[in-house]
Swiss-Prot record:
Belongs to the pseudouridine synthase TruB family. Type 1 subfamily. HAMAP family: TruB_bact. It comes from Shewanella woodyi (strain ATCC 51908 / MS32). SUPFAM superfamilies: Pseudouridine synthase, PUA domain-like. Responsible for synthesis of pseudouridine from uracil-55 in the psi GC loop of transfer RNAs. This is tRNA pseudouridine synthase B.
Length: 317
């Protein structure tokens, strides 16, 4: 007998405002439980120290989470100057203290060094894996593992403020950029050392900051719904963003209703306007119902790459 799926079928994306001190996985499990979702996944972990935008995909939206993992991010970071730690943040041990005596000119020159395309060596205190183990596990055992520099792109690096020994920056960067590493490297360029004391992710892809909601707010909404005698889903579900927002950067190809059965069975279909090697967002009919993503195959037809499951209740609706 097939095992019954736990939770309900619910598709969409929650823009969680993660609180400090909690792991991304803990936040994910709490959201999944509150929405009573059968499936959930986040789109790139935030350190426990960090706060801010953590898009959580529910249901069929999990099929497109990789595209948010690959998306640009924006952060606000505050660094404490004069102290370097072994983890490059305030969770670590201070390993060096130095006086702060750089000039404004040196600060601006140093910031310019990080803008644009550069190579970055990931921190040992990261989740990147070496021989199946996260680097931070080696670091905790005092083992230094060779790491290759990786290409990153800092699209914007804006100076916000310098108050006493605290420097605040706004950074818009490509995926895989370690803000702690930028902070540590900047501290060395300034000659005083630095480490992160506050990190907040303010944007993932083009998602609006204003749509974020915290776990505390979600819990309050559920409690209020129970007090009002209504189902929690009636207040939670309106918070969900459509799953196709995860792939909104791709151009839309709209197909006729008559083509849907062939496509949904995994078969390529004819479509106009296709370009080689381009991933497209596929919609069906006059209502432009999103069904997945695809690309042109060798025969010049639209071949599905990732399709959602259309359930019977959606067909009837």
């Amino acid at each position: 007998m097939a095992r019954r799926s736990r939770g309900r079928f619910i598709d969409g994306i929650v823009l969680l405002d993660k609180d400090t001190g909690m792991s991304s996985n803990f936040a994910l499990q709490r959201v999944k439980r509150l929405f009573n979702a059968n499936k959930a996944g986040h789109t790139g972990a935030l350190d426990p120290l960090a706060t801010g935008m953590l898009p959580i995909c529910l249901g069929e939206a999990t099929k497109f989470s990789q595209h948010l993992l690959d998306a640009d991010k924006r952060y606000t970071v505050t660094a404490k100057l004069g102290e370097r730690t072994d983890t490059s943040d305030s969770d670590g041990e201070v390993v060096q203290t130095r006086p702060i005596n750089f000039t404004q000119e040196l600060l601006m020159e140093s910031l310019e060094h990080f803008r644009g395309e550069t190579m970055q060596v990931p921190s040992m205190y990261s989740a990147l894996k070496h021989e199946g183990q996260p680097l931070y596990k080696y670091a905790r055992e005092g083992i230094e593992v060779p790491r290759k520099a990786r290409p990153i792109n800092v699209f914007e690096l804006n100076f916000i403020s310098l108050e006493g020994d605290e420097l605040t920056l706004d950074i818009h960067c490509s995926k895989g950029t370690y803000i702690r590493t930028i902070t540590d490297d900047l501290g060395e360029m300034l000659g005083c050392g630095a480490h992160v004391i506050m990190l907040r992710r303010t944007q993932v892809a083009g998602y609006p900051y204003e749509r974020m909601v915290s776990l505390e707010q979600l819990n309050e909404m559920v409690s209020q719904a129970e007090a009002d005698g209504v189902e929690a889903k009636s207040v939670l579900d309106p918070l969900l963003l459509p799953m196709d927002t995860a792939v909104s950067k791709f151009r839309e190809i709209n197909l006729a209703e008559s083509q849907a059965p062939y496509l949904m069975n995994g078969n390529p279909v004819h479509a106009s306007g296709l370009v080689a090697d381009e991933i497209v967002r596929i919609t069906i009919g006059e209502e432009h119902k999103f069904v997945g993503i695809g690309a042109m195959n060798d025969d010049g037809m639209l071949a599905p790459k990732r399709l959602i499951v259309i359930r019977e209740d959606e067909v009837k609706a």
